[in-house]
Amino acid sequence: MRTKLTTHFLLLFLLVSSISFANLKITNDQDPEKDKVLISVLNYMLTKGHYNQKELNDDFSEMVFNNFIADLDPSKRYFTKIDIKEFSKYKYQIDNQLKESDIAFYSLVYGRFLEKIKNAKNYYNAILKKPFNYKKDEVIDLDFKAIDYAKTEKELLNFWRKQLKLQTIDKIRDQENLDEEEFKKDQSFKKRSFSTLEKKARADVMESMENLYIRIDELEHRDWFSTF
C-alpha cells in the first residue's frame, strides 16, 4: 500500500507542478481560477485516487517533505540550511494540507526553488568570467546524499565555484588529451597553451550551463494549461 500511495502522490505532484510552473512564472499575482484548478486536482486525487486515509499521517508527510525537496535539489546546489529550516514547519503538516486542499508547503518550496534558479544564473555567470586559481588544491565532496546543505548563500556560492572549477579542469584535461593524440599522429602539431585551453574550457562550461538553464526556462514558461 505504501508503494502504491507514494506512486499516486508523485503523479499528483507532477501534474500539480506542471500547472504551478505556469502559475508562478506568468504572473506574480494570485490567479483564483488557477488556484481552483490546483485544488480540484488535489481533491480529485484524494477522493478518487483510492488513498488509504490511515496512511495520510505524519510519516507520509515526512516522506513527501524529504522526497519533494530532494527531487527539486538532488545535488544540494540551490537550497541552504536556512531554507530547509523554513520549509520544516510543514514537515508534519502535509497530510492535513492535502485533506484541506492547502498548497502552502508546495507554494513555499517551489516558489523558493524558482528564486534559486535565478540566483544560480548569477552565480555561474560571475564565477566563469575569470580563470580559477589552479595552483590552489581544493576538495569537493560530490556524494550529494551524504553532504549537508550549505549553511549560507556565501557557502553555497563557494560550492558552486568548486563544482564549476572541477568541470573546467575536466574539460582542460580532455583538450590536453586531444592535443596529445594529435601530436602523436603529427609531431609538427603545435599544442595549445594552457591559457588557451583554460579559456576554451571555461567557455565550454559556460555554454553547457546556458543550455541547461535555457531548457529550464522553457519548462517554466511552457503553457501547461493547454495540455491539462
Label each PLM-derived region with a short phrase.
Residues 9-18:
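Bacterial N-terminal signal peptides
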Residues 1-9:
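Bacterial N-terminal signal peptides that target proteins for export
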Residues 2, 20-227:
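Flexible, low-complexity junctional segments that flank or bridge functional domains
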